[in-house]
Amino acid sequence: MAKVDVISRVTVLAEQVISSLGMELVDLEYKREGREMVLRLFVDKEGGVNLDDCASVSRELSEVLDVEDVISEHYSLEVSSPGIDRPLKKVEDFQRFKGRLVKIRTFEPLPDDAGNKRKTFLGELKGIENGVVLVALKEGQNAAIPFEKVAKANLEFEF
């Protein structure tokens, strides 16, 4: 099975297992590290996840992956929290983390409300309306970024 097909199939199975445990799949990676393939999942829930949550996901998902035989080669399974710089991937994430400091990178330069074009936006997430991510920038301007133009978005740690 091609890598993209493995990722797609594992994502479906992982989302089923993780949601049944009251958590959400934030991100999934399947890549070679050294001589070994690593399947890394990042999970979260309201209030955050702990070691027992990660162990439960690992145990349950391992059983499902073994039965479904999705990955034919040897791999390591890692399950962890997304960390303080959690990626924002879904439309719902941009509403859920409203009020938090975010860093957003876009596929192409976009203007802020002062007309300055940039690809990196850092500021307070104001939410998402009609598919447009709203950010109050650190420099005082505002930005309205179409969701489909977001290449990468992460929460930023505030000191």
Swiss-Prot record:
Q: Where in the cell is it found?
A: Cytoplasm
Read off the InterPro entries from this record. Answer: Ribosome_maturation_RimP (IPR003728), RimP_C (IPR028998), RimP_C_sf (IPR036847), RimP_N (IPR028989), RimP_N_sf (IPR035956)
Q: Which family does it belong to?
A: Belongs to the RimP family.
Record's function text: Required for maturation of 30S ribosomal subunits.
CDD domains cross-referenced by the UniProt entry: YlxS_C (cd01734)
Matches recorded under PANTHER family: RIBOSOME MATURATION FACTOR RIMP
Which domain of life does the protein's organism represent? Bacteria
Any Gene Ontology biological process: translation
HAMAP family membership = RimP
Q: What is this protein called?
A: Ribosome maturation factor RimP
Q: Tell me a GO cellular component.
A: cytosol
Pfam families per UniProt: DUF150_C, RimP_N
Cite the source lineage. Answer: Bacteria, Pseudomonadati, Thermodesulfobacteriota, Desulfuromonadia, Geobacterales
Which key words are in the record? Answer: Cytoplasm, Ribosome biogenesis
